[in-house]
A protein has these predicted regions:
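Active-site neighborhoods and metal-handling regions in enzymes and metal-associated proteins
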Residues: 1-252
C-alpha cells in the first residue's frame, strides 16, 4: 500500500519534497496536554482515521504499532482492530542497511569522532564534567546533528559503578573520564561510541591495568569477527570477563 505521513497541522510543506511519501495528512493528537477535556473527541477522530485506512488498505483486521497508549488500544479493539507490537517487525527490517543508510551512518560516526577528538584535546584539570560534555553537543549541532539521548559522562570515583550522569563535578588531574556519546547525528542516525581518557595522560598502575584488560577484550573479540558469523556464535566465542569485574559489568 501507499506510504502515508501524518505531519503537523498546516506543516505539510515540511515533507512535500520526500519522494518516498505518497500522501501527507494532518496528524491527530489526543493527548491531554494538547487537548485537555477534548482529548476523547480527538481520539475518536483518530480512530475514524484508522478505520478509513483499514477499509482502503488493510488485508486483515490487524495493525502493527510500535508505541500506542492504552485508550487508543482499547478503542481500536472495540472497533474490531487488533493491535500487535511492531517492534520485532521494525527491528528486523532495520537489520538490512541500504547503501544510502551506510553513508548516513558513516557521516554520524564521523561527527561523533570529531566531537570525541575535541573533547580529548580540551580536557583539562579544573573544568567540570558538564563543560566537557557540552563540547560533544556543540560539535553535533555544528555539523548538522540532531540531539543526544543521554548524559552518561563521569570522572574519578563516579565512573564506577557506571551509568552516572554528567554533573558540575570538577575534573581533577590524573582522573579517568569515561562517556558514551549516545549521539543522534546528521540524518537522524545514531553514533553510540564509548571512550575513556585519563586527564593529562598520566596513568597510575590501576588505570594501566584497566586499560590493558580493555585492550585485551577488544583485540580478542575483533579477531573473531568474520563474514557470515551469527551473533549467537560471536557471543559463545567472545572474551570472558574476569570474575572480579563481573558484579559491576555493563547490563547489556
Amino acid at each position: 500500500g501507499p506510504v502515508i505521513l501524518y505531519e503537523y497541522f498546516n506543516c505539510e510543506n515540511l515533507s512535500s519534497h520526500l519522494n518516498l511519501i505518497d500522501e501527507i495528512r494532518p496528524a491527530i493528537t489526543w493527548d491531554y496536554f494538547s487537548n485537555g477535556d477534548q482529548a476523547s473527541l480527538e481520539l475518536k477522530k483518530w480512530i475514524n482515521e484508522v478505520l478509513d485506512l483499514s477499509k482502503k488498505y488493510f488485508k486483515s483486521k490487524k495493525i502493527a504499532i510500535d508505541v500506542l497508549n492504552g485508550p487508543a488500544v482499547t478503542d481500536l479493539n472495540k472497533n474490531g482492530i487488533e493491535v500487535v507490537d511492531a517492534k520485532s517487525i521494525l527491528e528486523q527490517a532495520r537489520v538490512i542497511k541500504s547503501p544510502d543508510e551506510i553513508i548516513c551512518m558513516k557521516a554520524a560516526i564521523d561527527v561523533a569522532e570529531i566531537g570525541i577528538s575535541k573533547m580529548r584535546s580540551e580536557l583539562r584539570p579544573g573544568m567540570t564534567e558538564d563543560e566537557l560534555w557540552s563540547i560533544l553537543h556543540k560539535t553535533n549541532i555544528e555539523y548538522g546533528g540532531e540531539w543526544i539521548e543521554c548524559r552518561i559522562l563521569s570522572s574519578g570515583q563516579r565512573t564506577n559503578p557506571w551509568m552516572q550522569e554528567s554533573s558540575n563535578k570538577v575534573i581533577q588531574y590524573g582522573e579517568m573520564v569515561g562517556f558514551d556519546t549516545d549521539m543522534v547525528g546528521p540524518y537522524g542516525y545514531c553514533a553510540d561510541i564509548s571512550r575513556s581518557f585519563v586527564v593529562d595522560n598520566k596513568f597510575n598502575e590501576e588505570q594501566k591495568k584497566l586499560y590493558s584488560i580493555a585492550m585485551e577484550q577488544i583485540d580478542y573479540n575483533s579477531k573473531l569477527i568474520k563474514n557470515g558469523m551469527a551473533f549467537e556464535e560471536f557471543v559463545e566465542k567472545s572474551w570472558v570477563l574476569p570474575q572480579e569485574y563481573y558484579p559491576n559489568r555493563y547490563s547489556v
